[in-house]
């Protein structure tokens, strides 16, 4: 059985339809799904994402779990809409070792959210959400847009 066949099987499941309908209700803002193990969670999530233009935020238990979930989602849906929002720290916040690559990933997620792109899927974990981020206004005021071939004075 291929990934596409599995995805179609999950997409037709009555629980996906029921949850999709529930997500359409304005009063519902947060949903916890339990009982989905291994790659079943990402297949279920991909079926939901395919049916809705709204952004989704999937909060997993820790970095490792989020990494596996992110990988599974990208295998099913591709990498264009799936974003990973990691902690900006290499190890734990208490050690204070920033990771430049993770800071770039965080900035990309915030930037694409600010643009209002439809159908985004953000995968993260509690440690990453605990960090402060700049406000939308501050990000907008401090964003410098450059074009290919443009000269910039760094002095």
Feature annotation, model-predicted:
Residues 1-155:
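ASCE RecA-like P-loop NTPase motor cores
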């Amino acid at each position: 059985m291929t990934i596409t066949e599995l995805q179609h099987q999950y997409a037709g499941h009555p629980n996906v339809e029921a949850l999709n309908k529930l997500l359409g209700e304005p009063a519902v803002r947060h949903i916890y799904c339990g009982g989905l193990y291994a790659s079943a969670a990402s297949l279920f999530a991909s079926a939901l994402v395919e049916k809705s233009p709204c952004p989704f935020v999937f909060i997993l238990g820790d970095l490792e779990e989020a990494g596996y979930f992110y990988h599974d989602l990208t295998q099913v849906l591709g990498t264009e809409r799936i974003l990973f929002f990691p902690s900006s720290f290499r190890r734990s916040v208490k050690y204070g070792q920033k990771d430049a690559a993770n800071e770039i990933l965080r900035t990309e997620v915030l930037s694409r959210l600010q643009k209002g792109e439809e159908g985004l899927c953000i995968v993260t974990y509690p440690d990453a959400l605990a960090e402060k981020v700049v406000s939308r206004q501050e990000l907008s005021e401090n964003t410098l847009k450059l074009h290919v071939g443009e000269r910039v004075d760094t002095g």
